[in-house]
Design a protein with these regions (language model features):
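Glycine-rich beta->alpha junctions and the first turn(s) of the following alpha-helix
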Residues: 2-14, 18, 146-230, 319-323, ...
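C-terminal helix-coil-helix/basic helical segment that borders enzyme active sites and/or dimer interfaces
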Residues: 2, 25-34, 226-255, 269-271, ...
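Amphipathic, small/basic residue-rich leader segments at the start of a protein or domain
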Residues: 1-77, 301-388, 398, 408, ...
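Extended, hydrophobic interaction surfaces within ordered domains
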Residues: 188, 195, 208-313, 631
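A short core secondary-structure module
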Residues: 112-158, 398, 450-496
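A short, Trp-centered hydrophobic/proline-enriched beta-strand micro-motif
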Residues: 29, 106-116, 131, 416-424, ...
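Internal helix-loop-helix
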Residues: 44-101, 352-411, 415-416, 458, ...
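Glycine-rich phosphate/cofactor-binding loops in nucleotide/flavin-utilizing enzymes
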Residues: 2, 88, 274-337, 368, ...
Length: 665
């Protein structure tokens, strides 16, 4: 999902793209190889530098988030010139120099902003300058002594500013944070162009008789680029929306600056030889990404800043204001007054336990109502019980089962009277469910199931199982599969616990030896099990975490981190955790707008798994002793399953490349 979310932001980004399509900004960048390019003629008419400035200085009275959306689109098109620094200066000077701010808004003035390096992007003889002097900044009019330099990034001029240039001294707080807020939007735009370019090339470039996008290695490169792009865009949007929040911008810069650089490098890799040529523009985007990162002092600086802020107690929470529901508030208050042991039944009977389920078992709640219910439960300190596999099984029964099956299983599952396991995976069919071999043959009044299932969580204590078995071996493998409900106490079932690397036994292998399943326990039509299984795997409610934006696992790290903790590594985890939280938020906003899951959903598991595994490993590294039963050791071992269960990371990378990016199978 791009940085632009609102209709206004989307329209602004589209206007920038339309302008770029008509004016070929890349050609202007190429033409300025030795001098660096200025803002192209005619671009000022778009008014981008004045988008977030007040009407009192001829601005558009928009937000910094609006400006970020435009900057991301401009960077995606490689619009040259000091657009970023001029827009930054406009925000900084709107209350200090209204005349100059008005010139910035109408595009007649451009400004270069110095942060650390003597070489200043955008500085030339005609530019205004903002240069640091101690804790303050000096505003220098055009004509100051600026030594022109040959820029690494051709899309902007580069100049060395003479020390102690005279000018107006100003108190400008948070210059660097505001600069980073806008720069990460540009970084997100660069990352998006690199992803798009690599994917489009992979769809048409042929090698060994097929397009290279069909090769797993290329798919995984592109899928990793997708993950970086989505994280960068989400964090750029968040930093701009929460402008002034130092942890938001530090987290964004910790992730997005590197995302742009890594995507540019991987884009060249996918392009191969053509990507290494001067004629292809990929290197121009790599130059822009590297220049952005250097201008802000490198991403390590921002990882350390994120860690410093978090260790000092700075926190953020993310949320969506969907209002309150008086009836829900009343119901929740009544449930909160009950003894703990009675609350689950009350939640189930009121429809609050699974509000997204249809009535009478749920409330048929839309996304907004689900969030209002969650907020009310959180405020009352009521934790919703986890139905585990029941939360997947029952929605399939509700959608495809009989009235008798719904009556028999839905309410008892909600109340905790029936627990479930899932008999899907087999020794030869893990993620590839269509290859399962468990057979079901017809008998009087039902079916006899024979086969072996594995990796079945909680099978040793579950009451019922949802089970896939092959009822017709003579049709293509995705067909001929039927969806059964299996009583785990039935004759012919043998359950054997599997000891995991944690030393515990949660997984099991289950042997089925002529297990009788009556026709009344078949869900849907025989042979339609594949479609129903996909329904099971897709069922999820709308939810939004209400804790710290950096994530629960990072919070535990922060509580126990020693004074000499590796702040670069900690800051990276804070950035990752923030990315996961913001992706979750943006996915929720999509659902509130009535849209289906976007790329965020595909990316969220990939990033979330990696984040939790790396956080667990860091916690283990911080442990004073490597003792087997410590929480850190157990969590590290447990998290190794996350990149396997529910689809391995490698399978999910391929799926993201095919289903989100459109690369061929």
């Amino acid at each position: 999902m791009p940085v632009a979310l609102t209709e206004e932001q989307t329209a602004l980004a589209a206007a920038v793209r339309d302008w770029a399509a008509a004016h070929d900004p890349v050609a202007a960048v190429r033409a300025a190889e030795t001098t660096g390019a200025g803002l192209p003629e005619g671009f000022a008419a778009l008014g981008l530098t004045g988008v977030a400035l007040p009407a009192s200085v001829n601005g558009a009275d928009g937000t910094v988030a609006d400006l970020a959306a435009g900057l991301a689109a401009a960077a995606e098109a490689l619009v040259p010139g000091p657009l970023l620094s001029t827009a930054l200066a406009g925000l900084l000077l709107a209350e200090h120099s209204k005349e100059l701010a008005a010139e910035i808004a109408d595009g007649t003035a451009h400004v270069a902003v110095q942060l650390d390096e003597e070489a200043v992007p955008g500085a030339d003889a005609g530019s205004w300058l903002l240069v640091p002097r101690g804790e303050r900044y000096v505003l220098v009019p055009p004509g100051a002594a600026v030594e022109p330099l040959a820029p690494f990034d051709f899309s902007r001029s580069l100049g060395r500013v003479k020390a102690d240039v005279p000018g107006e001294v100003l108190d400008l707080p948070d210059v660097r944070d505001l600069a980073a807020t806008l720069a990460v939007a540009e970084a997100a735009g660069v990352a998006r162009w690199c992803l798009t370019t690599a994917v489009e090339y992979a769809k048409v470039r042929e090698q060994f008789g097929q397009v290279i996008g069909a090769f797993q290695a290329v798919k995984h490169l592109c899928a990793e680029m997708l993950c970086r792009t989505e994280a960068a865009e989400a964090l750029a949007w968040d930093a701009a929306s929460a402008v002034g929040d130092p942890l938001a911008v530090a987290s964004a810069a910790a992730v997005a600056l590197d995302a742009a650089v890594e995507n540019a490098k991987d884009c060249i890799q996918v392009l191969g030889g053509i990507g290494f040529t001067w004629e292809h523009e990929a290197h121009l985007y790599l130059r822009r990404a590297l220049a952005l990162r250097q201008w802000l002092g490198g991403s390590q600086r921002w990882r350390k800043r994120a860690a410093d802020l978090a260790l000092a107690g700075k926190r953020r929470t993310l949320g969506v204001n969907v209002g309150e529901d008086a009836e829900v508030t009343r119901l929740v208050a009544e449930i909160a007054a009950l003894p703990e042991e009675n609350r689950r039944t009350a939640l189930a009977d009121s429809g609050l336990l699974a509000p997204h389920w249809p009535q009478p078992y749920g409330r048929g709640a839309d996304a907004a109502e689900q969030l209002r219910i969650d907020a009310a439960l959180t405020a009352a300190d009521i934790k919703r019980p986890d139905m585990v596999i029941g939360g997947w099984a029952v929605p399939t029964i509700l959608a495809h089962g009989t009235d008798e099956q719904r009556e028999r299983f839905a309410a008892p599952t909600l109340r905790g009277e029936v627990t479930w396991c899932q008999l899907f995976s087999e020794p030869g069919a893990g993620s590839d469910l269509a290859s399962l071999r468990t057979a079901a043959r017809r008998t009087d009044g039902g079916w006899l199931l024979t086969g072996q299932k594995v990796w079945t969580s909680l099978a040793h204590e579950a009451d019922w199982a949802i089970c896939l078995a092959r009822t017709d071996p003579d049709v293509p493998k995705h067909k001929g599969i039927t969806y059964f409900l299996v009583d785990m106490r039935a004759a012919g079932i043998t359950t054997r616990p599997l000891r995991e690397i944690t030393g515990r036994s949660v997984f099991n292998e289950v042997f089925l030896d002529d297990v009788f399943v009556p026709d009344a326990d078949v869900v849907g039509e025989p042979g339609a099990g594949w479609k129903l299984a996909r329904t099971t795997l897709a069922n999820e409610r709308v939810a939004l975490g209400r804790g710290s934006a950096v994530g629960e696992n990072v919070e535990e790290l922060l509580e126990s981190a020693p004074e000499d903790v590796d702040r670069d590594r900690l800051g990276a985890l804070i950035g990752q955790g923030s990315a996961c939280s913001v992706l979750d938020l943006r996915a929720t906003l999509r659902r509130l707008d009535g849209l289906g899951p976007g790329a965020e959903s595909s990316v969220a598991k990939l990033l979330g798994v990696r984040h939790r595994q790396e956080t667990a490993e860091f916690a283990l590294d911080l442990a004073s002793e490597l003792v087997a039963e410590t929480p850190a050791a157990q969590e590290f071992l447990l998290t190794r399953c996350l990149s396997i269960a529910g689809g391995t990371t490698q399978v999910l990378l391929s799926a993201a490349a095919e289903r989100v990016l459109g690369l061929p199978r």
